[in-house]
Amino acid sequence: MAQQGSGYQARYKRILLKLSGEALMGSEEFGIDPKVLDRMALEVGQLVGIGVQVGLVIGGGNLFRGAALSAAGMDRVTGDHMGMLATVMNALAMRDALERANITAIVMSAISMVGVTDHYDRRKAMRHLSAKEVVIFAAGTGNPFFTTDSAACLRAIEIDADVVLKATKVDGVYTADPFKDPNAEKFDHLTYDEVLDRKLGVMDLTAICLCRDHKMPLRVFNMNKPGALLNIVHGGAEGTLIEEAQ
């Protein structure tokens, strides 16, 4: 449940939190772990409790991966549409977890799904956010060939968020995959161009270029670290910050 009142001043007024679908699996190999949903709902609720406005984008990789089936012969557009539906399923699950924690949440889908979700409308989304309601943006951009990372950056720009927070399984951006390379070194700070030049694979090219062109800061952090999200909102240096060159 969101707790009202805090002695701390939040650094960010409005954030866009990007969660991977895989994050919802927890220790499972497929699907959604209810314990993970409840923990994430609690962390989001802490932000709402101190007055932070939260937009949320969730991937669909825990349920479906269109790109993989495309490589196996499925039509790419069909696969991407199926992937969008997977993100809607995750969004509905997250909304349910938030509401069980007494946090008002709205799902807005880029694909019209009357009776299931609200259709995405920027002005309505911003009104919901201003009313301290969590807005979950589903179905990506509504177009094939665009990732949910690109959708997250696009929505962040549209709703005038202060920062994009990308939750991952590692505590930032490394020179290589730290799970595979024990010598991988972590970056505390990067510019957009450094990410592109080094081909670090933080997000796809479209997402990084969107952030760069609109001067949208991006922080990559470990969602499995308790309190990391709240620490970031208070100005803590969790993970890796990516922004324009100073």
Swiss-Prot record:
Transmembrane segments: none annotated. Its main location: cytoplasm. It is found in: Cytoplasm. Its EC number is 2.7.4.22. Inhibited by UTP. Pathway: Pyrimidine metabolism; CTP biosynthesis via de novo pathway; UDP from UMP (UMPK route): step 1/1. Disulfide bonds: none annotated. GO terms for biological process: 'de novo' CTP biosynthetic process; UDP biosynthetic process. PANTHER family: URIDYLATE KINASE (PTHR42833), URIDYLATE KINASE PUMPKIN, CHLOROPLASTIC (PTHR42833:SF4). This is Uridylate kinase. The lineage of its organism: Bacteria, Pseudomonadati, Pseudomonadota, Gammaproteobacteria, Pseudomonadales.
